[in-house]
A protein has these predicted regions:
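Extreme N-terminal "head/tail" segments of very large remodeling/mechanoenzyme assemblies
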Residues: 1-135
Length: 135
């Protein structure tokens, strides 16, 4: 499996939509992610793990902790990862359960966790458990 593109929104230290084009790193298969403490290195790996498996790495972090503390109710929490597996491209999108702005009024409502996996042939698998099983 080779990650191609990662889009993170409202996730960990990434409040605003952030896109990381992993294809530009080349096809050598070895990447080095560096940065200051607190700059978001671990969050990148958590986002990839969450996109693929619906969970995060580490004993000290849980899915309920991944929403950015900087995100307002108008900002969604979601991760989108495209990846190559055996020469075919897949796209997975996931969001955890979180509080978002209600469609009517000024209140908030619960956004339920969800996932969508788009297969190379264009077919779509929906639902967190089904997507995790398919991956």
């Amino acid at each position: 499996m080779r990650p191609l593109n990662l889009v993170i929104t409202g996730f960990g230290t990434y409040c605003n939509r952030t896109e990381i084009n992993l294809e530009q790193l080349g096809s050598q298969g070895l990447y080095l992610i560096t940065g200051d403490t607190g700059s978001g290195k671990t969050t990148i790996f958590d986002a990839i793990t969450y996109a693929l498996y619906g969970d995060v790495n580490g004993e000290n972090r849980t899915v309920s902790m991944i929403r950015s503390t900087f995100a307002t109710p108008d900002i969604p929490t979601e991760v989108e990862l495209s990846f190559d597996y055996r020469g075919k491209t897949y796209l997975v999108k996931r969001n955890p359960e979180y509080e978002r702005r209600a469609l009517r009024g000024n209140s908030t409502t619960k956004q339920l966790a969800d996932a969508i996996l788009t297969m190379p042939d264009g077919s779509v698998i929906t639902g967190s458990e089904k997507v995790t099983s398919a991956i």
